[in-house]
């Protein structure tokens, strides 16, 4: 009989969002008249920007024209998109990148998982807690961990507590680790890292020959000046960091699928015998073998995101979501709740009232307010007692949801 990958059996029962879906489905079936408002999974609700949609259509039309038809594209992405990203997304930050250092993909979630293909299993990995579950679960899947303990911590991983007491900013680990996951603006807490904080991580990584996986999926939602949008704004990061970015939330591409990963040519890792090897070359080899590239029309649409017209339209949508975040944040505060985030990120991280558990609060909001959010404990043990709400809803639904919460909890 064929044998399976036993590591999958170590995973905690049910990925967070499917479990939310299961509970919501059960409640809906029992209460068919309830109008449920979903502020849980961070999916967007506003349509693609007109300039992006036009470029998307143009890309499809090109495929109907024999002279412009495109078949297989480069696995790394078309240069017209990569060059646009270099000029419009990175140069304004003072970051200089080469065409060979940007890889276009169909999602940051995939890249955050697939990047593990080029790293040895005996690397010591540090993950923030609470955290986007994909970081944790994919390390379990590849066999880097033992079993989970009663709290949900997996043997073999180093967890960096992000708590109310430390402002949800983890301390630099005292021991040596090889790979560090950082996400800023942070999902789920909505916090950001200053240049001083990121410099401390870069200095640690350089001193310990570690690699930082920097998830910048929400950088476009930063509203305050002086907050870094890229790890490469920090001197030396090109020698110790891989950056992941996504068009999903920035441009409403959750159903379109496009992202990018930056692997600098200066970034090296060691072989078993100590030889230094370029991670850029290894990632290129991995992508060329396992990935066929993002479709041409999608990349045409992605390039239009950074046109003057496209970015102006997208900025309006981002502002719409961040106004939702303000309304949620202030509404929850009026209800007497302690709230974090929602200023530089589209997520609000609230403290559950009266010491209630995260899942009990989920059930309370669902049954009493018909509002769905995300239990903080689903992001890790340190998320227990907290709850995440997303600002990606329609304005009317956001206002209705907050009104319901205020009436039931105030």
Swiss-Prot record:
Checking CDD domains in the record gives: AAT_like
Q: Where does pyridoxal 5'-phosphate bind?
A: 72, 108-109, 132, 187, 218, 246-248, 257, 292
Record GO terms (molecular function): L,L-diaminopimelate aminotransferase activity; pyridoxal phosphate binding
Provide the residue positions that the database annotates as binding substrate. 15, 42, 109, 132, 187, 292, 388
- Single biological process term from Gene Ontology: lysine biosynthetic process via diaminopimelate
Q: Which cofactor does it need?
A: pyridoxal 5'-phosphate
Keywords, comma-separated and alphabetical: Aminotransferase, Pyridoxal phosphate, Transferase
Pathway(s) per entry: Amino-acid biosynthesis; L-lysine biosynthesis via DAP pathway; LL-2,6-diaminopimelate from (S)-tetrahydrodipicolinate (aminotransferase route): step 1/1
Q: What is its EC number?
A: 2.6.1.83
Q: Which InterPro entries match?
A: Aminotransferase_I/II_large, DapL/ALD1, PyrdxlP-dep_Trfase, PyrdxlP-dep_Trfase_major, PyrdxlP-dep_Trfase_small
Q: Which residues carry this modification: N6-(pyridoxal phosphate)lysine?
A: 249
Reaction catalysed by this enzyme: (2S,6S)-2,6-diaminopimelate + 2-oxoglutarate = (S)-2,3,4,5-tetrahydrodipicolinate + L-glutamate + H2O + H(+)
Q: What's the top EC group for this one?
A: transferase
Q: Name one Pfam family in it.
A: Aminotran_1_2
What the record says about family reads: Belongs to the class-I pyridoxal-phosphate-dependent aminotransferase family. LL-diaminopimelate aminotransferase subfamily.
Q: Describe its assembly.
A: Homodimer.
Protein function: Involved in the synthesis of meso-diaminopimelate (m-DAP or DL-DAP), required for both lysine and peptidoglycan biosynthesis. Catalyzes the direct conversion of tetrahydrodipicolinate to LL-diaminopimelate.
Q: What is this protein called?
A: LL-diaminopimelate aminotransferase
Q: Which gene encodes it?
A: dapL
